[in-house]
């Protein structure tokens, strides 16, 4: 394969930091490369160097002769140009629509948008789609995409992954993409570059395969590095013990051993930056969370129906993912549950013990003039963790990645990912027992996302999450609902796969209106599903129920231990016994659901 872009010993600094240090890499025809790394470690800088927009401080960047590079930046400079000028150079519809690729991109990304309108009248998400469409249509040899899935829903992300994978399979150029969307990276990329800091200098490690292969390969590298470090420490202990005994003088061998011992001390590898989210105490949650009866929710002017005559019961420990195309009202549903919006009709009953933590897409609750440490100490200077240990605000922040001068940095000077991290930490300080999370993955790097997912795995409360990040959704939620339009909120036993399949079936039905579709045989049944598809759906639903049963068994075991420890505290014992009874009732309901599902 021909090399299209080469980096030779490239170094780039920013202030006192070295973001890239003597990095040598190549992009060849047919490559599909995913770039991962912590926020601020130099991913966007690397893209700028690859495209030629950023000159390195030293080293060389070469492009093959006549190379065309399409670059999707995180911002744009379209000014007041029309959408048609940006994406198809002003060509009329009958000209650009003759090209099937252009037509597909416009239909998928810009459906319903007037191409003769001005870009400066669009929302941020719509501008992002215009920029992405322009790059995809441009006929470039290399596509360099910085966070292309931002502002896209799961359906469009799935289309984009298929579009880019088809381009790579046809060997029509190369792709380099920065994304925090791990499902997307796994679906599209065949190579992964990790940008990280080693000894204060930015480096790039290359791994074969997509995100899943990268995780396994990195874990193996870390295991080998840990083994080597263990050997180094054992040898160092022996050498230091020998030095403490006092080496005999006037021989060459002791001089050699002293030098070797000093080298062992000097070569201690620096620790990789890590992010730790401490486990906070959680307020006790009773048996009632949310009960919706005959709810109708309308938003906007003129009123648009989001929910119509919906009955929905959400219990303790439920973990729900909510999906739907952009604009269907997912955020409005969360705001209604949080009490910020009132239903147009019907009732929303909230449990007496609810303590809701609502993570909004906006960061309005953060005062940009506050310093990071003050923003946490204003909530709590000392926090009690789940195990009873107390911890200071400064230590909490340092564990969660706010080290050094970041503690005294003003919030307005933080990156989007850092502000989102701070927002999540402040939310947990209030010890909520219900979390409503609206696009929680926005701006966060993969390491931080993994830490939050691990935290939510063991969190005992109720979680309702809206996200376009399919990996996060499937990791955090046990059940998926979809806002499908017309006021409906449908349970999807088959998860996101069923949602995408149903949406594809709806599009096909609209294109062939005379074709008759068999009626659904029950709630959650796929439209005209084959026996094999039905078996897959049932298997997935059984797996979901079994996962919930496993979690409840763990909670019951923990309650038994707590009851044994509180044997002499009759008040606490009664509280624990009530919780145990509720868990056992939930377990019974789930076992009944399992039997019904298994019977088909």
Please annotate each region the language model reported.
Residues 272-274, 346:
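Active-site phosphate-binding and catalytic loops of NTP-dependent enzymes
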Residues 39, 255, 277-278:
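Acidic, polar-rich N-terminal leader regions of halophilic archaeal proteins
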Residues 239-248, 276-282, 290:
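Alpha-helical coupling/stalk and coiled-coil linker elements that connect catalytic or binding modules
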Residues 1-227, 281-529, 535-600:
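ABC ATP-binding cassette signature C-motif
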């Amino acid at each position: 394969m021909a090399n299209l872009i080469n980096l030779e010993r490239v170094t780039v600094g920013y202030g006192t930091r070295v973001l890239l240090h003597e990095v040598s890499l190549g992009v060849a025809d047919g490559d599909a490369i995913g770039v991962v790394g912590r926020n601020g470690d130099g991913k966007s800088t690397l893209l700028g160097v690859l495209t030629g927009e950023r000159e390195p401080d030293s080293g060389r960047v070469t492009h093959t002769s006549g190379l065309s590079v399409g670059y999707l930046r995180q911002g744009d400079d379209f000014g007041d140009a029309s959408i048609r000028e940006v994406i198809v150079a002003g060509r009329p519809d009958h000209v650009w629509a003759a090209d099937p690729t252009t037509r597909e991109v416009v239909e998928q990304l810009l459906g319903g948008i007037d191409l003769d309108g001005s870009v400066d009248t669009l929302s941020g998400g719509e501008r992002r789609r215009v920029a992405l469409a322009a790059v995809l249509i441009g006929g470039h040899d290399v596509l360099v995409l910085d966070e292309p899935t931002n502002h896209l829903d799961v359906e469009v992300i799935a289309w984009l992954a298929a579009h880019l994978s088809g381009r790579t399979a046809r060997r029509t150029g190369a792709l380099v993409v920065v994304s925090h969307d791990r499902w997307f990276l796994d679906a599209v990329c065949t190579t992964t570059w990790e940008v990280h800091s080693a000894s204060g200098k930015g480096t790039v490690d290359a791994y074969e395969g997509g995100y899943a292969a990268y995780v396994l390969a990195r874990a193996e590298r870390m295991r080998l590095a840990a083994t080597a470090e263990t050997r180094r420490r054992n040898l160092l202990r022996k050498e230091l013990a020998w030095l403490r005994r006092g080496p005999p003088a006037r021989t060459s061998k002791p001089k050699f051993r002293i030098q070797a011992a000093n080298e062992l001390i000097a070569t201690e590898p620096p620790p990789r930056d890590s992010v730790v989210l401490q486990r906070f105490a959680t307020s006790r949650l009773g048996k009632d969370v949310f009960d919706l009866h005959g709810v109708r929710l309308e938003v906007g002017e003129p009123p648009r129906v989001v929910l119509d005559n919906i009955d929905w019961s959400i219990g303790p420990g439920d973990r729900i993912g909510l999906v739907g195309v952009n604009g269907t009202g997912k955020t409005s549903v969360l705001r209604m549950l949080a009490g910020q919006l009132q239903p147009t009709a019907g009732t929303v009953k909230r449990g007496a013990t609810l303590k809701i933590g609502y993570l909004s897409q906006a960061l309005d609750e953060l005062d940009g003039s506050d310093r990071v440490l003050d923003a946490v100490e204003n909530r709590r200077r000392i926090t009690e963790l789940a195990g009873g240990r107390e911890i200071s605000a400064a230590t909490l922040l340092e564990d969660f990645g706010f080290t050094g001068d970041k503690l005294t940095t003003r919030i307005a000077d933080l990156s989007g990912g850092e502000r989102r991290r701070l927002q999540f930490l402040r939310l947990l300080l209030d010890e909520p027992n219900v979390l409503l999370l609206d696009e929680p993955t926005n701006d966060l790097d993969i390491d931080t996302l993994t830490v939050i997912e691990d935290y939510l795995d063991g969190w005992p409360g109720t979680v309702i999450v809206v996200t376009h990040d399919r990996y996060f959704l499937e990791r955090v939620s046990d059940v998926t609902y979809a806002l499908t339009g017309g006021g409906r909120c449908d349970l999807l036993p088959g998860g996101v796969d069923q949602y995408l399949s149903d949406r594809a079936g709806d599009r096909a039905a609209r294109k062939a209106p005379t074709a008759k579709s068999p009626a659904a045989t029950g709630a959650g049944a796929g439209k005209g599903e084959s026996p094999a598809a039905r078996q897959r759906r049932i298997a997935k639903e059984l797996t979901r129920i079994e996962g919930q049963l496993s979690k409840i068994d763990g909670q019951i075991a923990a309650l038994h231990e707590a009851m044994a420890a509180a044997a002499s505290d009759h008040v606490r014992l009664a509280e624990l016994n009530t919780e145990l009874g509720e868990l056992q009732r939930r377990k019974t309901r789930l076992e009944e659901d399992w039997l019904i599902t298994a019977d088909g």
